[in-house]
UniProtKB/Swiss-Prot annotation:
The keyword Electron transport does not apply. It comes from Colwellia psychrerythraea (strain 34H / ATCC BAA-681). Pfam families: CofC. Pathway: Cofactor biosynthesis; coenzyme F420 biosynthesis. It comes from the Bacteria. This is 3-phospho-D-glycerate guanylyltransferase. The gene is fbiD. NCBIfam families: F420_cofC (TIGR03552). GO terms for molecular function: GTP binding; phospholactate guanylyltransferase activity.
Amino acid sequence: MRTNIVIPMKDPQLSKTRLDPQLSSRQRQALALSMFKTTLSFFNKYFPQHHLLVVTASEFISDIACTYGASVLIETKLGLRQAVESAARWSLNNDFQSQLLIPADIAELDYREFERLLMIYRPVPSVLLCPAFDLGTNALLTTPPNAIPFLYGIDSSLAHQRVAQERDIVCQVIKLPALALDIDTPDDLELLALLSSPVTQELNKLCKTA
């Protein structure tokens, strides 16, 4: 089953605004860019068999994505929902049977978690999601790519489950501890400070010195 891995990414100048005033604008941009590049590098290294698509309105981000061998979909409309809807259409038009949406702000990506996620049996149609600690959606695997509407926002993992149930679509929820931590709020920064891997240490350093 051909799976398209989709990474939406804002212009770094517009990223991580909820971390203000804990981080300066420069720190927020450095943090967002570091996590984005780490995400691209991770999938290139561990899952080269899967196609990568970056959805962005930023030419700067587009150029970075291309250096990692990712395809780019320029989406100028505002909002994550519009971006991922465009990505789903792109996935369908390019003959992908599944689409995996991943944010570019996961603190630490774990190969074993993604291997488990991608190996789970997926009937057609189906939805497989990994909730964030705050009940957002940190991974959304849809088969076909447009199996359900995309409902990002507060408690979006619950919203995605509800819409799948309303449509009688199989929805599996898998809880993965590393994938559950995205960096969006001051509380997330506090959790990040408790982690000690090389990747998270580098992120913590950026938050203090950039």
